[in-house]
Amino acid sequence: MAFLMSEFIGLGLAGASVLSNALLRRQELQLQRQALENGLVLKADQLGRLGFNPNEVKNVIVGNSFSSNVRLSNMHNDASVVNAYNVYNPASNGIRKKIKSLNNSVKIYNTTGESSV
């Protein structure tokens, strides 16, 4: 009887070990998924700050069978976004022209001090 009892205890411990491993694995998978989601949100946020359309970013990162050929369009170069920005921010009107004129006026000097553009 003692043999059966020890066998029973051994099986019980083995079962508990399997259950414990399963719970640890489940917890590990949850943490991995959470880290992945946080990483995706961070990446989408970074791309959004760079001026990419958040919806396009989401489609590209998460993936969508309906739109497999989605390409990111930079919102800063999107004429409709630029026009809307100019309407709501009058102070920014002509900013591209100002930047272009600034770039044109910048002189580049070589080591001998001669300017060249």
UniProtKB/Swiss-Prot annotation:
Pfam families: VP2_lagovir. Disulfide bonds: none annotated. It comes from the Viruses. Keywords: Capsid decoration protein, Capsid protein, Host cytoplasm, Virion. Its main location: virion. Transmembrane segments: none annotated. GO terms for cellular component: host cell cytoplasm; viral capsid, decoration. It is found in: Virion; Host cytoplasm. InterPro entries: VP2_lagovirus (IPR008558). Homooligomer. The portal-like structure consists in 12 copies of VP2. Interacts with capsid protein VP1. The N-terminus domain points away from the virion surface. Belongs to the lagovirus VP2 protein family. Translated by a ribosomal termination-reinitiation process from the bicistronic mRNA coding for VP1 and VP2. Minor structural protein that forms a portal-like structure at a unique three-fold axis of symmetry, following binding to the host receptor. The channel formed by VP2 may allow the delivery of the viral genome through the host endosomal membrane. This is Minor capsid protein VP2. It comes from Rabbit hemorrhagic disease virus (strain AST89).
